[in-house]
Amino acid sequence: MTDTVSRPLRPRPALTEDNSFFFEGAKQGKLLVQRCSSCGVLRHPPRPACAQCRSFEWDTVEAAGTGTIYSYVVVHHPQVPAFDYPLPIAVVELAEGTRLVADVIGVAADAVRIGMPVAVEFVAVDDELTLPMFRPT
């Protein structure tokens, strides 16, 4: 009999009616961003009301999936079993102007730089969860 050790699952996002579109879009290979229906401002993370005009009306737009690294950190500790370390995590400024936090993949952690151009890649981290991550271009 062979024992196989399976990797622990990543922590699950807390799904709400305001953010579930984002994770459903990721499963379909789409980077969806919330847009205020009243003033057109894009926002991320998703939330119920627009910070600019206070409207509760919104829709979504598909982002191009390209941008640059606005800021980043490299996580070394504490190590959580579901992740590989060192773990570069960036604030990515999308071409559309809004920013989001995501893993940086396909590059050594010490090679990540502010201003580095990146493109989205959708990674199925397990059978239930697909996340947008960014790879240098």
Description of each model-found segment:
Residues G67-I69, V104:
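Conserved hydrophobic positions within beta-strands
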Residues L42-R43, F56-E57:
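Cys/His-rich microdomains that often coordinate metals
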Residues D3-T4, G97, A102-T137:
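Well-ordered alpha/beta subsegment
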Residues W58, V73-P78, A109, V123-V125:
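Short, conserved beta-turn/loop elements at beta-strand boundaries and strand-helix junctions
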Residues K30-V33, R47:
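Residues immediately within or flanking Cys/His clusters that coordinate Zn2+
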Residues R35-S38, A49-S55:
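Short, cysteine/histidine-rich loop/knuckle motifs that typically chelate Zn2+
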Residues Y85-L100:
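Short, basic/aromatic beta-hairpin or loop at an interaction surface
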Residues M1-L31, T137:
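A broadly conserved sequence feature marking short terminus-proximal activation segments
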